[in-house]
């Protein structure tokens, strides 16, 4: 990965893309810097991801709360100000929220 010069991100200027869950929707605002992806993601009320994700992430909860469920049945509750970290192909996981949540998600080759 090459050096990233100082820059600011005005999330109000980043286009939202819609992604359907098993229930509810996710809205992504994505910045791609080489192999580094930074997303501000909003899950609507009663959102359940439609797949088990195997990608590594750093996930920080900006607003609301959600459950990160692992494929082995473990569940972790996260709320505003909390973060989780997982590497690629270590723990398949999915997100669930009843009230909606706003997350900052960072992923890339550094999590392999």
PLM regions with names:
Residues 1-40:
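A short, N-terminal "cap"/entry segment at the start of jelly-roll beta-barrel domains
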Residues 34-53, 87-90:
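Conserved short histidine dyad/triad with adjacent acidic residue
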Residues 48-53, 69-70, 95-96:
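Short histidine-centered beta-strand/loop micro-motifs
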Residues 52-68:
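Short, conserved beta-strand element in jelly-roll/cupin
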Residues 72-89:
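Short acidic-glycine-tyrosine-enriched beta hairpin
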Residues 88-112:
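Ligand-binding loop in jelly-roll beta-barrel domains
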